């Protein structure tokens, strides 16, 4: 028995399912999860001393790769000064100013501890500001695990085949309206049905928890117009896409200005973090300036602020995102070439340092149903065979993958070689 297997069995006796986040349990691909002990650059090393090229990147935060020296230095400096004070620090201001300088839609920002906290607070803020109750989300978009948002969500719910979750009374979700991503007509119909009671529309501008879905620009523009027409707020959940698909987030790439933006992952440089920001008059509704309450013991903690600030300083360097996008494109092209050589239907897409793929003969993937109809059995076989070759993709076909600045031509060539070998073996099996 491997040490990973031994640890997993031990973990199951004390931790529900043996993991602290469901997708880590490998339920989406079968088998047992790998336990890791270290990471450096583009690589992870497991507890059995096997090395892997890492395309998960802690689910997005590690855009600079594992243990980047600038991030380590920043955290180390703070570590010896105090990990948390429960009081204001200068680092909070510095990170807030840096984020606002890179995302013009953000005039004020509140730091929290996770993406879930950020989206939960954003919905509360939108309701408080507009004095309306209902909100629209999209099937397959994941906005954390707060009760009102865990309806037809993506991420682990899709991986586990759970359409929603027990433990949430219907009374809590009665104000949650859902529509299909990229379907503007459905959104318009909801606004027509509830013209005076929709507080906000929330979406991942580039969903990464129902596979990897690129938005239609007309869809995003239409959402902005509908929100303006009905005096509703537009929330971009950029916890995943913020500073990952481009220096100014998805909103910068597509030229759409949301009223509220939620952030996480990269702005903490690998530390637990979340944030919500937006127009001054909206953000001023948050306590203690306004009546909408939100608080957190570790919000704005120095370790996360230091790691996030160091990360943002690195990614704003000249050509960073051009190089990152090129590397991600090379990866998806390499995977597509390997699939084509094996005559296996395959679709891949990427944006910035984010990508996704599935085994399908469709020429485009536009929503959750397109991903769900792809060959999941083949994905599972591909995942495990690639893992055996030392390539670690997300253990679910519903999760996006991530490339860091440390993934170079060598790593992509190794990935291509492994994919070509694996896909030819699967084709002939």
UniProtKB/Swiss-Prot annotation:
Its cofactor is pyridoxal 5'-phosphate. GO terms for biological process: protoporphyrinogen IX biosynthetic process. Its main location: cytoplasm. GO terms for cellular component: cytoplasm. InterPro entries: 4pyrrol_synth_GluAld_NH2Trfase, Aminotrans_3, Aminotrans_3_PPA_site, PyrdxlP-dep_Trfase, PyrdxlP-dep_Trfase_major, PyrdxlP-dep_Trfase_small. Its EC number is 5.4.3.8. It catalyses: (S)-4-amino-5-oxopentanoate = 5-aminolevulinate. GO terms for molecular function: glutamate-1-semialdehyde 2,1-aminomutase activity; pyridoxal phosphate binding; transaminase activity. It is found in: Cytoplasm. Pathway: Porphyrin-containing compound metabolism; protoporphyrin-IX biosynthesis; 5-aminolevulinate from L-glutamyl-tRNA(Glu): step 2/2. Keywords: Cytoplasm, Isomerase, Porphyrin biosynthesis, Pyridoxal phosphate. The modification N6-(pyridoxal phosphate)lysine is found at residue 265. Homodimer. Belongs to the class-III pyridoxal-phosphate-dependent aminotransferase family. HemL subfamily. This is Glutamate-1-semialdehyde 2,1-aminomutase. It comes from Legionella pneumophila (strain Corby).
